[in-house]
C-alpha cells in the first residue's frame, strides 16, 4: 500500500508492505540517482538489518557506508550528531548525496536532524524498524535531539524523500519495545479514528494479536498522520492534536532520565493523567478516562508513573514546544475520535499534575 503525503513543496510516499525491506535498493533507486549514501542506525538494528540493506543498496548502484551508534534515547543528543557530521565529512558526502535512517524513533529523529542541517540540508529517507517509528515519528518531517532541559528541544522540520515500512521487522522487537508503540496507535484512535478504536477494542491485547494486525494498525495510523501533516505541516493547528498525552509524557521522559521510560509508555501515562483531570473539570466526557486506562492496560502499557514529582514535572513542562509565552496549548479529546485544543496558563497546568 502507498500513502501519499501531498505537501506542495515536498510530496512523498509511504510504502507499507510485508517484506519490502529486501527491496530497499530498488525502492531508493526510484527516488534517487546512484550516489553516495550513509546508513545511520544504532548498534542493535545494525546487527539485524544493516548488512541486508547495504547489499540491497549496493546492488542498485549506490556507494554505501554505515554509521551506527549505541542504542537508546540517551544517545539522541548533539554529541552523537557531531559524530555523525564527522563521519559524513570523512565519507565525502556532498549535497547531492543522502542519508538512510534505518531504525526506531531515536535513529529517525537524529538522522533526519543531521540530514536537514549538514551542508544546510541533504536528502534523506526513513526505513523505520519499531512500531512507534512506523506509525508516528518517521512521518511528517519532525526531526530533533534531546537536551538536558527537554525532549526534542533542538530540531527542524524537514520532510524525507520517502518512507519504507516493512511490518515483518516488528517480529524481531522485544515485547516491551513492541507494546510501547501501541501508546501512539491508541492515541490515533482517540483523536481521529473511531474505526481504529473499534479494532483495538476487538483485539485481545496480546503480542500475537498486535503482530497479526500490524499492517492494518500501521495503515490506519499513517492515514491519520497524513491528514494532520498535509493540513498543518508546521504544527500550528490541527497537527497539534497528535500531541495528546505528549505534554505530560515528554515531561515524564525528561525527569525519569532519557531511556528509562519508553516514549509510548510515557504517552500512555500522559493520556491517562490528562484525561483524569480534564474529566474532573468537565472538559472531557464522563467515563473516557476509564476507557483509555483499560485500553492501555489491555495492551500492557503503564498507566501510572511511580516516581511522580510535581515540581520536577512542572519544570520540564515549562520547556514544552506547544508553549507560547505563558500559555500552553493542551490537547484534549472532546469525544471518541475528536480532539480539541484547550489553552491553559502554565500556572493552570499545575492542576493537571495533581494525582
From Swiss-Prot:
Superkingdom field: Bacteria
UniProt: Zn(2+) binding residues: 184, 246, 263
Binding site for NAD(+): 71-76, 105-109, 129-130, 142, 151
Coiled-coil spans in chain: none
Gene3D superfamilies with a match to the protein in the record: 3.40.50.1970, Dehydroquinate synthase-like - alpha domain
Predominant location category: cytoplasm
GO cellular component: cytoplasm
Cofactor note as given: Binds 1 divalent metal cation per subunit. Can use either Co(2+) or Zn(2+).
A matching Pfam family: DHQS_C
GO biological process, one term: aromatic amino acid family biosynthetic process
PANTHER family, alphabetized: 3-DEHYDROQUINATE SYNTHASE, 3-DEHYDROQUINATE SYNTHASE, CHLOROPLASTIC
Function summary: Catalyzes the conversion of 3-deoxy-D-arabino-heptulosonate 7-phosphate (DAHP) to dehydroquinate (DHQ).
Protein name listed in UniProt: 3-dehydroquinate synthase
Organism: Streptococcus pneumoniae (strain JJA)
Lineage: Bacteria, Bacillati, Bacillota, Bacilli, Lactobacillales
Amino acid at each position: 500500500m502507498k500513502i501519499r503525503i501531498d505537501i506542495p513543496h515536498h510530496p512523498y510516499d509511504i510504502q507499507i508492505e510485508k517484506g519490502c525491506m529486501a527491496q530497499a535498493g530498488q525502492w531508493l533507486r526510484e527516488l534517487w540517482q546512484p550516489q553516495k549514501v550513509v546508513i545511520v542506525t544504532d548498534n542493535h538494528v545494525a546487527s539485524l538489518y544493516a548488512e541486508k540493506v547495504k547489499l540491497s543498496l549496493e546492488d542498485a548502484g549506490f556507494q554505501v557506508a554505515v554509521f551506527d551508534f549505541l542504542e537508546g534515547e540517551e544517545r539522541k543528543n548533539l554529541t552523537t550528531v557531531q559524530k555523525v557530521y564527522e563521519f559524513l565529512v570523512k565519507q565525502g558526502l556532498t549535497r547531492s548525496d543522502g542519508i538512510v535512517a534505518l531504525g526506531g524513533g531515536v535513529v529517525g529523529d537524529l538522522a533526519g536532524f543531521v540530514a536537514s542541517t549538514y551542508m544546510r540540508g541533504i536528502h534523506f529517507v526513513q526505513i523505520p524498524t519499531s512500531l512507534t517509528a512506523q506509525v508516528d515519528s518517521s512521518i511528517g518531517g519532525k526531526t530533533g535531539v534531546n537536551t538536558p532541559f527537554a525532549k526534542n528541544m533542538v530540531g527542524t522540520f524537514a520532510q524525507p524523500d520517502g518512507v519504507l515500512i516493512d511490518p515483518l521487522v516488528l517480529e524481531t522487537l522485544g515485547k516491551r519495545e513492541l507494546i510501547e508503540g501501541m501508546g501512539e496507535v491508541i492515541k490515533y484512535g482517540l483523536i481521529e479514528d473511531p474505526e481504529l478504536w473499534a479494532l483495538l477494542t476487538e483485539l485481545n491485547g496480546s503480542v500475537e494479536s498486535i503482530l497479526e494486525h500490524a499492517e492494518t494498525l500501521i495503515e490506519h495510523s499513517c492515514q491519520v498522520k497524513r491528514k494532520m501533516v498535509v493540513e498543518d505541516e508546521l504544527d500550528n493547528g490541527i497537527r497539534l492534536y497528535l500531541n495528546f498525552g505528549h505534554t505530560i509524557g515528554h515531561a515524564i521522559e525528561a525527569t525519569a532520565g532519557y531511556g528509562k521510560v519508553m516514549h509510548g509508555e510515557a504517552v500512555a501515562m500522559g493520556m491517562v493523567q490528562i484525561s483524569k483531570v480534564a474529566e474532573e473539570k468537565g472538559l472531557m466526557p464522563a467515563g473516557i478516562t476509564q476507557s483509555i486506562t483499560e485500553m492501555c492496560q489491555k495492551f500492557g502499557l503503564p498507566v501510572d508513573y511511580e516516581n511522580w514529582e510535581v515540581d520536577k514535572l512542572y519544570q520540564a513542562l515549562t520547556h514544552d514546544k506547544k508553549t507560547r509565552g505563558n500559555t500552553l496549548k493542551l490537547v484534549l479529546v472532546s469525544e471518541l475520535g475528536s480532539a480539541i485544543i484547550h489553552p491553559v496558563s502554565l500556572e493552570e497546568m499545575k492542576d493537571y499534575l495533581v494525582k
